[in-house]
Amino acid sequence: MKTLIVVDMQNDFISPLGSLTVPKGEELINPISDLMQDADRDWHRIVVTRDWHPSRHISFAKNHKDKEPYSTYTYHSPRPGDDSTQEGILWPVHCVKNTWGSQLVDQIMDQVVTKHIKIVDKGFLTDREYYSAFHDIWNFHKTDMNKYLEKHHTDEVYIVGVALEYCVKATAISAAELGYKTTVLLDYTRPISDDPEVINKVKEELKAHNINVVDK
């Protein structure tokens, strides 16, 4: 069974008025909306993800003294007794739950409502970063994505949305590691970076995890 996963098509990422606008993200609205309705694709299920942060989320630069957005930051494991760390990035405040910025863009939300499409939220625990729609960066806390896919007998996932080098990539890798046949549809994604080398590296990482990377 095939499931389409639409990643983070939210105002803060897609609208020019958003706080963390992905370049050319608006270009995806109509194509992804059409893709969700494409009968030839034979989607068994569609899942839409959202960043859904509390205002004090650890990934927001404003919540750290003397830190600016896009600066590097060392995340420490939230698990007591675990001294592991991960290097990451601090972001502008974005997708604070129940605000305009966290809302799905209208065309996607309309389909969610009319077709009763599943929404999976991530990033709602204050003390940890998330990119994958399956779990936090530590793989400690799990969202309900995998349980939903298993419940509906999914064995194949197709992933679209933003941003390619962050949440799309992480979600695809998680899906592949969980045993799903995974495909990223590049024409239906957009990266934050405009560096071709960054995009090439993402493609290589995806392919190294046996993920299909195709245009459409």
From Swiss-Prot:
Annotated localization: Cytoplasm; Nucleus; Peroxisome
Thermal characteristics: Heating at 60 degrees Celsius inactivates the enzyme. Heating at 60 degrees Celsius in the presence of substrate prevents inactivation.
EC class (word): hydrolase
Organism: Saccharomyces cerevisiae (strain ATCC 204508 / S288c)
Name of this protein: Nicotinamidase
GO terms, biological process: negative regulation of DNA amplification; nicotinate nucleotide salvage; rDNA heterochromatin formation; subtelomeric heterochromatin formation
Record has Metal-binding as a keyword: yes
Keywords: Cytoplasm, Hydrolase, Metal-binding, Nucleus, Peroxisome, Pyridine nucleotide biosynthesis, Zinc
Reactions this protein catalyses: nicotinamide + H2O = nicotinate + NH4(+)
GO cellular component: chromosome, telomeric region; cytoplasm; nucleus; peroxisome
pH profile of the protein: Optimum pH is 6.5-7.5.
CDD domains: nicotinamidase
Its biological purpose: Catalyzes the deamidation of nicotinamide, an early step in the NAD(+) salvage pathway. Positively regulates SIR2-mediated silencing and longevity by preventing the accumulation of intracellular nicotinamide, an inhibitor of SIR2, during times of stress. Also acts on nicotinyl hydroxamate.
